[in-house]
């Protein structure tokens, strides 16, 4: 939020921090969650939202086969531009997004590298995280049996090699033989979302050996620890929480030396909807 005009102050010497800056806590990581279940924008609303995107973004949204996936993707792209515009204090139209060789989107204009963000959408929710200087990763999962699988047992057999023996033992805790049920599926998705959040934070996808990363999760507190290649990793802070009874969300936030033993702050914000405005900035539709 822009501050109002106030009394003028003498500028600090170049390279010196003011007392307020020295005492101010590090900026919190922004985390926005938008529930999109049941959102079916009219053609005019969708066209208005798409008009604010780059051509490459519009093409990515339209490539999704199912309408609900297109709606989630569209909402996510709009949220990205809204968050970046607020953080950099620019008009969304001034923002240009590009992708790394590994496919991770980043802000290319107006100020390259000034804001890190990551988006996830699955089930009923879209979640976006962002911070000016910390790498971030987020992944949301809905607790449901994947489409196209005949049984949970078949699904678990297919995914077994994505986890370390320790992780797999915790996921299958209490299982008898090959039989698995809803509690095991929930734990599966919790560990899976942690791995995904980490990979998204470091900007690597295909080619990373998932068994290199072994997570230990305290389900009560949501605090997770990562052992990477057999050694405790301290580069990132990991947290898992519930958006509702059917969805979990994992976040990975880069840890800075100045943080000491404190975990980076995460400021969660549940959005009521997406505002669609005309040329004069008048709200036409609250599209939630």
From Swiss-Prot:
Q: How is it used?
A: Polyunsaturated fatty acids may be beneficial in prevention of cardiovascular disease and treatment of mild Alzheimer's disease.
Q: Which residues bind Mg(2+)?
A: 139, 196
- What's the encoding gene here? PPTase
Q: Name one Pfam family in it.
A: ACPS
What are the protein's GO molecular function terms? Answer: holo-[acyl-carrier-protein] synthase activity; magnesium ion binding
Q: Which GO cellular component term is one of those annotated?
A: cytosol
Described by its record, this protein's role is as follows: Phosphopantetheinyl transferase that is essential for attaching phosphopantetheine to ACP domains of the polyunsaturated fatty acid (PUFA) synthase converting the inactive apo-synthase to the active holo-synthase.
Family (UniProt): Belongs to the P-Pant transferase superfamily. AcpS family.
Q: Which organism is it from?
A: Thraustochytrium sp. (strain ATCC 26185 / S-3)
Instruction: Reply yes or no: does the keyword Cytoplasm apply.
Output: yes
Give GO BP annotations, semicolon-separated: fatty acid biosynthetic process; lysine biosynthetic process via aminoadipic acid
Lineage of the source organism? Eukaryota, Sar, Stramenopiles, Bigyra, Labyrinthulomycetes
**Which reaction is catalysed here?**
apo-[ACP] + CoA = holo-[ACP] + adenosine 3',5'-bisphosphate + H(+)
Subcellular localization(s) per the UniProt record:
Cytoplasm, Cytosol
Put simply, this protein is called: Phosphopantetheinyl transferase
Q: How does it assemble?
A: Monomer.
Predominantly, its location class is cytoplasm
Quote the SUPFAM superfamilies the UniProt record gives: 4'-phosphopantetheinyl transferase
Q: What domain of life is recorded for the organism?
A: Eukaryota
Q: What is its EC number?
A: 2.7.8.7
Query: Which UniProt keywords are present, listed alphabetically?
Result: Cytoplasm, Magnesium, Metal-binding, Transferase
Q: Which pathway does it operate in? A: Lipid metabolism; fatty acid biosynthesis
Sequence positions that bind CoA: 60, 99-104, 118-121, 196-200
Q: Please name the InterPro entries in this protein's record.
A: 4-PPantetheinyl_Trfase_dom (IPR008278), 4-PPantetheinyl_Trfase_dom_sf (IPR037143), AASDHPPT_N (IPR055066), P-Pant_transferase_sf (IPR050559)
């Amino acid at each position: 939020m822009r501050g109002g005009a106030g009394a003028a102050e003498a500028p600090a010497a170049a390279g010196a921090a003011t007392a307020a800056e020295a005492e101010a806590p590090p900026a919190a990581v922004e985390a926005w969650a938008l529930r999109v279940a049941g959102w079916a924008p009219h053609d005019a609303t969708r066209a208005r939202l798409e008009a604010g995107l780059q051509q490459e973004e519009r093409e990515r949204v339209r490539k999704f086969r199912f309408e609900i996936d297109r709606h989630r993707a569209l909402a996510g792209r709009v949220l990205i531009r809204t968050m970046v515009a607020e953080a950099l204090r620019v008009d969304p139209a001034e923002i240009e997004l590009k992708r790394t060789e590994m496919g991770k989107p980043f802000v290319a204009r107006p100020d390259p590298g000034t804001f890190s963000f990551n988006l996830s959408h699955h089930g009923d929710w879209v979640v976006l995280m962002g911070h000016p200087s910390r790498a971030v990763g987020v992944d949301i999962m809905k607790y449901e049996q994947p489409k196209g699988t005949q049984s949970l047992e078949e699904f678990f057999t297919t995914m077994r090699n994505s986890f370390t023996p320790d992780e797999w033992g915790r996921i299958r805790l209490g299982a008898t033989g090959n039989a698995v049920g809803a509690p095991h599926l929930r734990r599966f998705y919790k560990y899976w979302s942690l791995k995904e959040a980490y990979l998204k934070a470091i900007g690597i996808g295909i080619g990373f050996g998932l068994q290199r990363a072994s997570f230990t999760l305290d389900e009560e507190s949501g605090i997770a620890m990562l052992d990477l290649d057999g050694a405790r990793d301290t580069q990132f802070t990991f947290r898992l929480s519930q958006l509702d009874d059917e969805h979990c969300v994992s976040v990975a936030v880069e840890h800075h030396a100045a943080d000491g033993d404190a975990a980076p702050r995460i400021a969660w914000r549940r959005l009521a909807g997406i505002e669609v405005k005309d040329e004069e900035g008048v709200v036409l539709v609250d599209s939630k």
